[in-house]
Each structure stands twice: as structure tokens, then as C-alpha cells.
Regions:
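Short, conserved phosphate-binding/catalytic loop or strand-edge motifs used
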Residues: 142, 177-186, 222-224
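Noncatalytic alpha-helical scaffolds and linker/capping helices
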Residues: 188-191, 198
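Contiguous, function-dense segments enriched for cysteine-driven chemistry
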Residues: 158, 189, 217
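Hydrophobic/aromatic-rich core segments of domains that either
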Residues: 199-289
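Short Pro-Gly-centered flexible turn/kink motifs
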Residues: 1-5
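Secretory-pathway-linked proteins and extracytosolic
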Residues: 6-21, 27-35, 40-179
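Edge strands and adjacent loops of beta-rich recognition modules
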Residues: 20-23, 27-31, 277-294
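Extended non-catalytic domains of envelope/secretory-pathway proteins
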Residues: 132-140, 184-186, 230-231, 252
């Protein structure tokens, strides 16, 4: 038997909403931009898979097909551009024990109307600065001063702040009202609730570092999978970066280091991340953890 089905998505690729009267709900976080990550693998034998997207004629889009091949085309229809991608005779991917994520091994399509990662970095920075995610809080500043008292070096201060946040802001995946998605909740909410997801823990550390006199910003990363050069939103985790006295940015992940000595989990070596810094940044990669650390 053959089963043929179609899926329709409107607007923001991750909204996955249908029959909603409020058009605002289809707007992506980065307004005016479109991006999608399309798996072209299957769990059951598939004769043909087709992905098609229409854009305004004046909108540019870049795309790339990874780990395989597909038929692709772009056609003009009235005032629209229609991109179509198709693959025939698809068989289920053979999985292996402890293999890498399928996004790193199986066919996938990535597309984005955002020209460069730097554009995404600048947007991420502005979004959270405009929202006031890291505004100081008197009672939190008092805790920061208490923690760094007697600490002489920048690394001593960074370490004590990172570990306090890691050990005292509990991970709790709950909805906490306005400010979901790419907008980090503010210092008052995080310090009062003492819980949240990765972005709330990272946001707490950024606030603490700023109140201690450091320059710190949020960063997006993808734990467990590679991030490609196409600037789509292939992220599932939020971390922090702090600017050291030598001018370089150091990544910090308080979510993954509670009750351990590391500041950046060694499980996240050679992992791509995108800092939301005021000057904008290209995609970065975390360093290899030195052997003497283990």
C-alpha cells in the first residue's frame, strides 16, 4: 500500500500552528527572516519526499543539502519565488550504537534568509539588552559582593560566581510567562525564583558577572550536534561568555557544571556556539579540554 500525505506550515518554521486567527503568532523571533531545518531521512521506506517553500520575489534565501543529494529547483510564480526539494526511493537510516546525532549523519536540508551568523549574533544581543534581561538587582548585588570578597584574580571571581549560580539556580523546565524563546528572563525573576531552564541559569550568571564588573553576554549552542554555516536556528542550549582582561571571550556553562570543578563541561568540547555580543560574532567552537584537566 502507498500512503501519500502533505504537511502545510505557515510563517515561522517552529510555530507549527494551523487555523489560528491571530497572524502575529506566525511571526518568527527574528522578524522578517525565514529559516528551516528539514530532515530528509525516514523511519519507513518512502517513495518520494518533497519540500516546497514560497517567498516574496524580493526575499533572498541561501540553502544547502548535507550528507546526501536531492533534486532542487527555484521557479517564479507571479510575485513569488518557489523553492522545491525532492528525494526519491528513501530507505530508513541504519543506526549504530553510540552513533552521532542523525542531523550529523543523515540527509538534511538547511535554509535561511539571514545572510550571516553575525546578523543573528547582533539580533540576539539587541533582543536581550532591549528587554533588560541583565538589569542589576540590589539583593543580588549584595550576594555578588559577598561571593567575590577576598578573591584576587579574575578567574577566582569568575569561578566562584559560576559555581554559585550552577549550584543554587535549580533546573526546572516550566513556563514562566512572557520572555520565552530567545529572550532571557530578567535578574529579578531568576534570583527570586531560583529556578529555570538553561537560559535562566545562564542569564543569572551573566547578571552576576556584570554586577561584579565583568563584560558578559549570552550565547546559543547545540549540545550533541553540529551547527552548520547556514545561519538557521540549530540551537537547543543557552550558555554565557565573559570577556577576559586579555580581550578574549571565555565560554561558561553553569547548567552543566553544578557540584563539579569545571567551568565549561568537558562533555561540550569542540561544540559550536554563537555569542550575542555588541560587535557581532561569527559561529565559534569550544576548545578541546587539556589532558591535565582529567
Amino acid at each position: 500500500d502507498i500512503i501519500e500525505y502533505e504537511l502545510h506550515k505557515k510563517g515561522f518554521t517552529y510555530a507549527l500552528l494551523t487555523d489560528q486567527p491571530d497572524e502575529e503568532r506566525f511571526v518568527p523571533p527574528m522578524r522578517g527572516q525565514f529559516y528551516d531545518i528539514v530532515p530528509f531521512w525516514c523511519d519507513d521506506p518512502t517513495m518520494r519526499k518533497v519540500y516546497s517553500v514560497t517567498l516574496p520575489r524580493e526575499k533572498e534565501m541561501q540553502f544547502q543539502f548535507y550528507q546526501g543529494e536531492c533534486a532542487s529547483s527555484m521557479r517564479y510564480e507571479n510575485d513569488r519565488k518557489v523553492y522545491t526539494f525532492a528525494k526519491n526511493n528513501m530507505m530508513p537510516v541504519r543506526r549504530e550504537p553510540n552513533m552521532v546525532d542523525l542531523y550529523d549523519a543523515a540527509p538534511k536540508l538547511m535554509m535561511s534568509s539571514t545572510p550571516h551568523w553575525k546578523d543573528k549574533s547582533l539580533w540576539f544581543h539587541k533582543t536581550n539588552e532591549d528587554y533588560g534581561s541583565f538589569a542589576p538587582l540590589p539583593e543580588a548585588r549584595q550576594k555578588v559582593n559577598e561571593l567575590i570578597r577576598g578573591k584576587k584574580t579574575e578567574m577566582e571571581k569568575i569561578a566562584v560566581l559560576t559555581h554559585w549560580v550552577a549550584d543554587n539556580i535549580r533546573y526546572a523546565g516550566i513556563t514562566r510567562g512572557k520572555g520565552e524563546g530567545f529572550t532571557l528572563h530578567n535578574t529579578k525573576m531568576n534570583y527570586t525564583d531560583r529556578c529555570g531552564v538553561c537560559k535562566d541559569i545562564a542569564g543569572s550568571l551573566i547578571s552576576f558577572l556584570r554586577m561584579a564588573g565583568f563584560e558578559a553576554y549570552p550565547a546559543m549552542t547545540m549540545a550533541g550536534s553540529r551547527v552548520e554555516s547556514i545561519p538557521a536556528d540549530h540551537f537547543n542550549h543557552c550558555v554565557a561568555v565573559v570577556k577576559l582582561s586579555n580581550g578574549t571571550y571565555m565560554p561558561l556553562d553553569p547548567t552543566w557544571v553544578p557540584f563539579c570543578r569545571e567551568l565549561w563541561s568537558s562533555a561540550e568540547q569542540q561544540q559550536n556556539y554563537l555569542p550575542g555580543v555588541p560587535e557581532g560574532s561569527d559561529l565559534c567552537i569550544t576548545p578541546v579540554s587539556a589532558p591535565e584537566n582529567h
